[in-house]
Amino acid sequence: MRAATGVQYELTAETPSGPAAAVITEVAAGLRAYSVNGIDLVETFPAESPPPKGAGIVLVPWPNRIRDGVWVQRGVKRQLALSEPALRNASHGLLRFAPYREIGRTPGSVSLAATVFPQTGYPFQLDTEVTYALVADGLEVTHVLRNVGEADAPVALGTHPYLKIGDVPTGDLVLRLAAGTHIEVDDRMNPVGESPVDGTPFDLRAGRRVGDLDLDDGFGAVEATDGRGEHSLTAPDGRSVILWGDENMRYVQAFTPRNFPITVGDGEPVTGQAVAIEPMTAPANAFNTGAGLRWLTPGETWTVRWGIRHRGF
């Protein structure tokens, strides 16, 4: 049976922490697996299955949602397809089900490319590239977006990895988000406000146990140190997995579903809690609010980087 996510690009490298391995998918240029010294650091899923709850996929030219799939450009109303019909939103961009093509490969890296062609609601053309590379201290991901059309194009970018630390129950991990604001949403998960997290249950800067959280929430004002904002999960024994984003990743979505199909070893998936830490350059509904939205001029290129590293093992 052919994999539901197309070609599976298997990466391997020797690192100071031991052998590292990753699997990247042709469809959505997704991160299907990543491990160091045999310890899984992202939730994986069978090759014959679609990504559960968007696991690992690239979100472009917007992450999260656009209310009603509608946005207005200089007085012209644009209508996108409603890819989240239950909530009447356009969700997670235009390439989540698209195949990418290979443009570069080494044993420890792969570069994939896909084009966003002009279409209903998005009359622009973007060339997109993503490179996954196993490096000494983790996994580094580089996105390059280029406007190859004739008009300024609105763009934003995000990714959807679910992090873990081996067989440690997700509920026992401590989630830390380096974010200073929380984004309030309506019943359709679109922003209605943004408030400081100080003194609220959404202040995760000091960390909270994942099992005590029920989140599908956006956060802003990501605090960067040396050009990177860092969010983490920490196990009771002190081991941590850290997701970092460059200065473009000023927002993050945290999602803690309790009905994720957890895969353990070669066994059948079992339902359990997972945690996605989704770095984003813009929050939900950015095409309407303008928050974090980037307009690329014809011929302009934009590079965004993020990655995963580990500590304590």
Predicted segments with their positions:
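A short, structured loop/turn motif at beta-sheet edges
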Residues: V72-V76, E102-V110, A133-G138, D167-V168, ...
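Short, Gly/Pro- and small/polar-rich lid/capping loops
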Residues: M1-P16
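Active-site/ligand-binding surface loops and adjacent short beta/alpha elements
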Residues: Y162-N248
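Acidic-aromatic substrate-binding/catalytic surfaces of carbohydrate-active enzymes
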Residues: A21-K77, L82-E84
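Acidic, contiguous internal or C-terminal segments within carbohydrate-active enzymes
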Residues: A13, A21-A22, V116-D167
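Short Pro-Gly-centered flexible turn/kink motifs
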Residues: W71-Q79, H143, W295-G312
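Extended, loop-rich substrate-binding clefts of extracytoplasmic carbohydrate-active enzymes
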Residues: M1-A3, A81-A136
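Acidic/His-leaning functional-site neighborhoods
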Residues: N89-I103, V174, L213-T289
